Amino acid sequence: MGSVSKTVISARGASPDDEQNGTKNGISNGSEWAKCIFLFFFLFIAGMSNWAVLAYTHDYVPRESLPDIVFSLVSEQRWASSLGDFCVALCIVMLGALLVIHQHRGTILKRVVFCAGTLYAMRSVTLAATQLPSGYTDNQGRCRDQVESEAGVFFGRLFEQTIRIGFQSKDQMLCGDLLFSGHTLVMVTCSLAVAYYLPKSIKPLQWVSHVACLIGMICMTISRTHYTIDVVIAYWLSNMVFRMYHAYCEVDMCMERRKSILYSWWPCRIVDWLEQDIVPGRLENRCQLPWRRSTPRGQERGGASAESSDSSVTMCDNITTSHHQKHVSISSSSTYPLPC
């Protein structure tokens, strides 16, 4: 067993002693802090870019709404806008509760933040590329007046959006924040995370977030906060980003990850860096309140080291741990798992 583990590490370009001595606590902590700082600024800049585009394009967006299949079937329901916001808040609360009770809350938070940042970065590009008019029946009354572009007006709007975290007054708002739906990407990402990471004993609670997400998407359309296409694209992209990230994480060996077609997609290079200290494979979904110390049972699958002071850092190079053992044979062409 020991010789196989050493062979695997040597194949990754490290000495056999790296399994025990290669990662010191200081280096690991520094790496984790670097990842946290990167993710914070990534999400912050992605969000700010959305608000900056809205602050600028509001004065150029037409006021005549476009045809939409749902708009032709259902009249504008203004009450649904508030219900949609409530559904967004409920999905966020569900995710927050999951982070409180889950043993690997730090790993989950990093993954969700990266997915959200990626989606908001995509959204800022679509907002800047194509400006759609709002779908309200009375766009002139619901949207703020259009003025000549000035730096003072732009930065004032940007500051307002920043302190409100993107939320706006329902009566006088900046218009053109449409393609694609930010409400939907938040709800879908949160509900996917809740469903994926909930421990089995409380798995049925995932339906709370799923139902809230479905109702919220319907409300976004019938309230004419978004066109149907905004919601559909947001749903597709949110699923794609979340599932591609986790499909990459579930590739059960680091060397196989590098051979995967996913690795050729440049965001997966960042994912590879974010996941380098986490044992490949699916997280073990287990409850553990943050104020309770974990028992010294060894390292758990999926990076328990980030959440427990009683275990050492689990690196991607370390193929064998007490709860996640891999028996592998390395040839010049590929790797093959052997039965344990």
Curated annotation (Swiss-Prot):
Parts of the chain on the Cytoplasmic side: 223-340
Subcellular compartments: Membrane
GO biological process: ceramide biosynthetic process; sphingomyelin biosynthetic process
Annotated Pfam families: PAP2_C (PF14360)
Assigned keywords, A-Z: Lipid metabolism, Membrane, Sphingolipid metabolism, Transferase, Transmembrane, Transmembrane helix
Entries under InterPro entries matching the protein: Sphingomyelin_synth-like (IPR045221), Sphingomyelin_synth-like_dom (IPR025749)
Main localisation: membrane
Active site annotation, chain numbering: 183, 226, 230
GO molecular function, one term: ceramide cholinephosphotransferase activity
Pathway participation: Lipid metabolism; sphingolipid metabolism
Record's GO cellular component terms: endoplasmic reticulum membrane; Golgi membrane; membrane; plasma membrane
Residue spans crossing the bilayer: 36-56, 81-101, 178-198, 202-222
PANTHER family on file: PHOSPHATIDYLCHOLINE:CERAMIDE CHOLINEPHOSPHOTRANSFERASE 3-RELATED (PTHR21290:SF34), SPHINGOMYELIN SYNTHETASE (PTHR21290)
Main function: Bidirectional lipid cholinephosphotransferase capable of converting phosphatidylcholine (PC) and ceramide to sphingomyelin (SM) and diacylglycerol (DAG) and vice versa. Direction is dependent on the relative concentrations of DAG and ceramide as phosphocholine acceptors. Directly and specifically recognizes the choline head group on the substrate. Also requires two fatty chains on the choline-P donor molecule in order to be recognized efficiently as a substrate. Does not function strictly as a SM synthase.
Record protein name field: Putative phosphatidylcholine:ceramide cholinephosphotransferase 3
Provenance organism: Caenorhabditis elegans
Lineage, highest ranks first: Eukaryota, Metazoa, Ecdysozoa, Nematoda, Chromadorea
